[in-house]
């Protein structure tokens, strides 16, 4: 009770108990991942008894991550789907966000609701719905890589729209109106003023789409047509119930490093865009009118 009383007496203070709870949560979240990464470097096949450091499960022994065709193919297929999702969902979500932000006519509210629907729909419902769609309506596409890419893009598109629209709201209309007042064509105002200001949101959206695609299991599983379209999460799920080796840990570690590297790179680019936000005014002043 004393903790709650002190919190309500000074809600803007620095509650020590909150720092303790946060630390416990972070440690609890990191421990399983750290153990999985540790056994990727195990010298033996055991996944419960650590015998020494080794890189054999990455590229040094038969059955290692880069020697096992199934593991290597799953990793490459995951990266392929993630790249396709980023390349398609990011620009498409950007233009949808721009359109929805400017749409004030009839049906705008319903369209906004439909755009947010994938965020609140259970992923298993989305997976089953897409499976039935590709079987009964779009049978000419069939299950496989194309269907998986479309499914992931459908699911992740809403993230891009929400993030970009949030940035559009914070930017406001002042920069565009200033460029228009100076006689800049709409396309020039978009290309030289608005898009640089949207840079942080675009980069953040692309990073989230990439991470979401790389981690997706349910939709990718439903739209798969066999071993050739297995991703890392699908392979980890199927093999971990049998007699897995630390090579699985190695593949998971590689995927984790790629994801973290992508997020770090996106953060650095985000900071670069954020620090150069004032350049929009300079662009307006130097527009070729």
Which residue ranges define each predicted feature?
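Transmembrane-helix boundary motif in ABC transporter permease subunits
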Residues: 2-11, 83-115, 128, 132-136, ...
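Loop-to-helix entry region at the N-terminal start of transmembrane alpha-helices
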Residues: 70-80, 135-159, 199-202, 206
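Hydrophobic positions within alpha-helical transmembrane segments of bacterial inner-membrane proteins
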Residues: 33, 82, 86-94, 98, ...
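Membrane-interfacial helix termini and adjacent extracytoplasmic/periplasmic loops
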Residues: 4-8, 55, 107, 124-156, ...
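A structural signal for multi-pass alpha-helical bundles of membrane permease subunits
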Residues: 30-45, 77, 127-139, 207-213, ...
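Interhelical loop and adjacent transmembrane-helix boundary motif
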Residues: 8-14, 45, 52, 57-69, ...
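C-terminal transmembrane helix and the adjacent membrane-cytosol boundary/short C-terminal tail
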Residues: 2-6, 12, 17-20, 107, ...
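Transmembrane alpha-helices
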Residues: 20-33, 153, 160-164, 171-172, ...
């Amino acid at each position: 009770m004393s903790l709650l009383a002190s919190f309500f007496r000074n809600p803007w203070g620095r509650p020590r108990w909150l720092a303790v709870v946060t630390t416990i949560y972070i440690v609890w979240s990191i421990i399983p991942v750290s153990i999985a990464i540790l056994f990727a470097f195990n010298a033996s096949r055991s996944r419960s008894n650590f015998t020494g450091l080794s890189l054999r499960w990455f590229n040094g022994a038969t059955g290692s991550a880069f020697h096992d065709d199934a593991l290597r193919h799953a990793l490459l297929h995951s990266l392929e789907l993630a790249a396709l999702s980023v390349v398609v969902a990011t620009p498409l979500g950007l233009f949808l966000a721009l359109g929805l932000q400017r749409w004030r006519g009839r049906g705008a509210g319903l369209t906004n609701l439909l755009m947010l629907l994938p965020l609140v729909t259970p992923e298993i419902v989305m997976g089953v719905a897409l499976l039935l769609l590709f079987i009964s309506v779009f049978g000419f596409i069939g299950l496989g890589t194309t269907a998986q890419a479309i499914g992931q893009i459908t699911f992740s598109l809403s993230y891009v729209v929400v993030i970009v629209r949030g940035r559009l709201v914070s930017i406001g209309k002042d920069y565009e109106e200033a460029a228009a007042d100076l006689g800049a064509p709409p396309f020039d105002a978009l290309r030289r003023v608005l898009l640089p200001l949207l840079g942080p949101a675009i980069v953040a959206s692309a990073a989230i789409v990439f991470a979401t695609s790389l981690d997706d299991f349910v939709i990718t599983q439903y739209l798969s047509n066999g071993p050739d379209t297995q991703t890392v999460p699908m392979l980890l799920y199927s093999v971990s119930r049998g007699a897995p080796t630390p090579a699985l840990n190695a593949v998971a570690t590689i995927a984790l490093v790629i994801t973290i590297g992508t997020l770090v790179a996106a953060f650095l680019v985000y900071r670069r865009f954020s620090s150069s936000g004032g350049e929009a005014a300079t662009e307006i002043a130097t527009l070729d009118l």
